[in-house]
Amino acid sequence: RQRQMCIRDRAETPLHDIRLMMMRKFSDIPALTLTASIGHKLHMETVFKKYNPDYVFHAAAYKHVPMMEDNPGEAVINNIEGTRIIADLAVKYGVQKFVMVSTDKAVNPTNVMGCSKRICEMYCQSLNKAIVDGKVKGCTQFVTTRFGNVLGSNGSVIPIFKEQIKNGGPITVTHPDIIRYFMLIPEACRLVLQ
């Protein structure tokens, strides 16, 4: 079977940007870009059936804490239900490895977004254990990786800080004792691919 990369996102513009970047930098790797929501079960089933992926890197999520505090139902629908849909499909279609990108906010969560990601982690962990214990038929290995702040990524706090400094400050911090952990995009990529 020919290797190819299938990239799925529901945000059209970033998906188009990825397509152009892949053509420019990695023209030897066929890259399919599909606009779809992970919460759309029938569409996701079609994607898994048609492309039969060996690996799934699941980074889809609503991640802005204040937005999810105001829209908790969306955190449940997109983050939790979307994860359940594609994790179950990964098992059904024999994906070798399912890597879920989570957040440091899932550690002892104190907000809706962190809680939603912790539930996603728990679902993937329990599915992995059920496969290992023979309670669920499958071969998929589930792995979760947690990130803090990824410099240069969408939603990073750095652009907010830059804008606040440009406008004369002050810099907004959620708590004076908070410690923020940062990594670069290449470091995040290496962590996901381990």
Where on the chain are the PLM-derived regions?
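A short helix-to-beta-strand connector/capping loop
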Residues: 26-31, 138-140
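Helix N-cap at the beta1-alpha1 junction of Rossmann-like dinucleotide-binding domains, i.e.
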Residues: 11-14, 38
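Conserved residues in the N-terminal Rossmann fold of short-chain dehydrogenase/reductase
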Residues: 34-35, 77, 175
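Conserved Rossmann-fold NAD(P)-dependent oxidoreductase catalytic core, especially the SDR/UDP-sugar
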Residues: 58, 62-122, 126, 132
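Short, small-residue-biased leader/transition segments that mark boundaries at the very start
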Residues: 2-7
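Hydrophobic/aromatic anchor residues within beta-strands of the central parallel beta-sheet
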Residues: 33, 75, 98, 142-145
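Conserved Rossmann-fold cofactor-binding substructure of NAD(P)-dependent oxidoreductases
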Residues: 35-55
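NAD(P)-dependent short-chain dehydrogenase/reductase
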Residues: 88-91, 112-194
